[in-house]
Design a protein with these regions (language model features):
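Gly/Pro/Ser/Thr-rich low-complexity, intrinsically disordered segments predominantly at protein N-termini
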Residues: 1-191
Length: 191
């Protein structure tokens, strides 16, 4: 897909991002540039789907959870793998949620150096700066995979409050209580 030149030297805007046609790619707006990614690998999609299920089972009525939702984060347009937001805002049917309507985002780390950097060092500080209270990161690589980390927003950005690897139970208190073993995110179904 070809994009026209940005209207200013500052790059594209969230408004430009929201005008993009629907494609089979995830297109995010990061620091004024469009970043296109193919749809994730099946193991990534399965882990995302299973985490959405675990979270959805515990949600209070005031919240909703979706996979791969558009979120306007300051001057960026990001697509977290999972978005938990206020039901009232989400059910209005917006194309993108304002960060103020989001209580938690999750990223399932994609393979490759550029993708890992984006999920570890680029996107989390942007979510924190926008005031999103909880960030969840799921890493599917390494000997202890899957590993899930939970971060709560502190004064200096996100602070790690819990982590667990496959075979141990992870318990979250915020934004709502939920417990699960990260092992359920990958591998054969348990039911």
């Amino acid at each position: 897909m070809l994009f026209p030149s940005p209207p200013t030297t500052a790059g594209y805007t969230v408004e430009d991002w929201l005008k993009l046609p629907t494609t089979g790619e995830r297109i995010e707006l990061i620091d004024g540039s469009f970043i296109a990614s193919p749809m994730p690998a099946y193991v990534h999609a399965i882990a995302t789907s299973r985490l959405v299920g675990a979270l959805d089972d515990a949600l209070p009525r005031s919240l909703e959870v979706v996979a791969a939702g558009n979120v306007a984060v300051g001057d960026d347009g990001l697509i977290p793998d999972i978005v938990i937001g206020h039901a009232e805002a989400m059910l209005k049917g917006p194309v993108a949620l304002s960060a103020s309507d989001v209580v938690c985002v999750a990223e399932v780390v994609s393979p490759g150096k550029v993708n890992r950097d984006r999920d570890y060092t680029i996107k989390p500080p942007k979510y924190a700066a926008a005031g999103i209270p909880v960030f969840i990161r799921v890493d599917l690589e390494g000997g202890d995979a899957p590993r899930v980390e939970i971060f709560n927003l502190g004064e200096q950005g996100y602070e790690l409050v819990a982590e667990a690897k496959a075979g141990t139970v992870l318990t979250l208190d915020q934004p709502f209580p939920v417990s699960f073993d990260p092992a359920v995110l990958t591998g054969p179904r348990s039911r």
